[in-house]
Amino acid sequence: MRAVVQRIKEGKVTVEGEITGECNFGLLVYLGVGREDTVEDAKYLAEKIVNLRIFEDQEEKLNLSVKDVGGSLLVISQFTLFGDCRKGRRPSFSEAAKPDEADYLYQEFVRCCNDVGMTVGTGVFQAHMMVHAINDGPVTMLIDSKKTF
């Protein structure tokens, strides 16, 4: 499972002009599910992101988590995070999970975040979405449950 995590001042996602999720302060999480991913990957990534210390403390050190600062999450499904662009000019998505499995694990990730008390806004799985965000910092992290960057 792979995530691009951005610290944001605010964000929202719309589908066909309707707001489906929003976050007034916290993290925007683009979440991709790989074909080898399991519920354990969803649990690992949820725990990692909720406790990731990328907010500044009083000494301006990145020492606080989204949970510590009372923020929320905006989670957007994004299979393109598993796009492989190494060959040719068209990305291959063969490493992305099939839609049914990806949706299940996406929902499991959201549930894991909710279970630890996080407020989570979401997009609509497989929908064409418009994501609006005001980045803070910017602070952007790449996290993968199976490999390092």
Curated annotation (Swiss-Prot):
* Record's subcellular location: Cytoplasm
Q: Does the keyword RNA-binding apply?
A: yes
Record-level Gene Ontology MF annotations? D-tyrosyl-tRNA(Tyr) deacylase activity; Gly-tRNA(Ala) deacylase activity; Ser(Gly)-tRNA(Ala) hydrolase activity; tRNA binding
Which EC number(s) are documented for this chain?
Answer: 3.1.1.96
Q: How does it assemble?
A: Homodimer.
Which family does the record claim for this protein?
A: Belongs to the DTD family.
Domain free text: A Gly-cisPro motif from one monomer fits into the active site of the other monomer to allow specific chiral rejection of L-amino acids.
Name of the molecule in the record: D-aminoacyl-tRNA deacylase
Write down the species.
Answer: Alkaliphilus metalliredigens (strain QYMF)
